[in-house]
């Protein structure tokens, strides 16, 4: 899996950064992409990547501010105009359903694919055989969430040598044994799969924050994650201004990573006031608190 940042700016686009959108490529688990936020111009950014709109199976919106949302109608209708019939699920705060339906209705647009819209509240919003996604409330002028993505633990490796030593022949029953099931052999012996399976392989975990000032939910949202994505709208000298608008400073993002035990912090959602030559200074502010910090830029890739 990997994250690709499609937009890393805050509020308005700049020549260097588009507004917010992040793609999570699930390659290695399944042939699909999840999108987190969809600011204006996201579909233009996608055209410059290998991402296929038809393979975007889920979109998670953190909140309904335009720089996280206004690219959604265009992406949905373009996906439809390209003849896509693969279903999609859209998650977001209350009002997301009205926004999409009104945009489509007023523009005389329609979709060629099934779109399920789920208006979320805090708590688990999705789980299947591979992943669990949980929403956490953040502190912002409008209802806003951060999403924690946990890959479920996988069964450990099957010890084929141990099985052979115990006279268990290879065959289709190896799959059942790897799942921890019991299998009855032709000679009548009952073999318990858990006796031959190694320790579970821990799944990966990510925390993707929406816009927020310091909030109580942050430590649980990001507890022990492999990658934490957090906004750093303004530098530490402008922290009071950032907090007054429901945002965080560089140092505040780094403190969340430090206190939650995250392994890596990626900062994004930078004010358009900052140009390329400012980035090293902002990154240094974070690394002074949390050394394992990276700064996202548009189209940056980070393995998960």
Swiss-Prot record:
Molecular function terms in GO for this entry?
Answer: 3'-tRNA processing endoribonuclease activity; exonuclease activity; zinc ion binding
**Coiled-coil annotated residue ranges, if any:** none
Checking CDD domains in the record gives: RNaseZ_ZiPD-like_MBL-fold (cd07717)
Is-annotated flag, keyword Disulfide bond?
A: no
Q: Where does Zn(2+) 1 bind?
A: 63, 65, 140, 211
Does the keyword field hold Transmembrane helix?
A: no
Co-factor(s): Zn(2+)
Report keywords, A-Z: Endonuclease, Exonuclease, Hydrolase, Metal-binding, Nuclease, tRNA processing, Zinc
The UniProt record lists the EC number as 3.1.-.-
Where does the record place the catalytic residues? 67
Q: How does it assemble?
A: Homodimer.
> What this chain does, per the record?
Zinc phosphodiesterase, which has both exoribonuclease and endoribonuclease activities.
Q: Which family, according to the similarity comment?
A: Belongs to the RNase Z family. RNase BN subfamily.
* Protein name, entry field: Ribonuclease BN
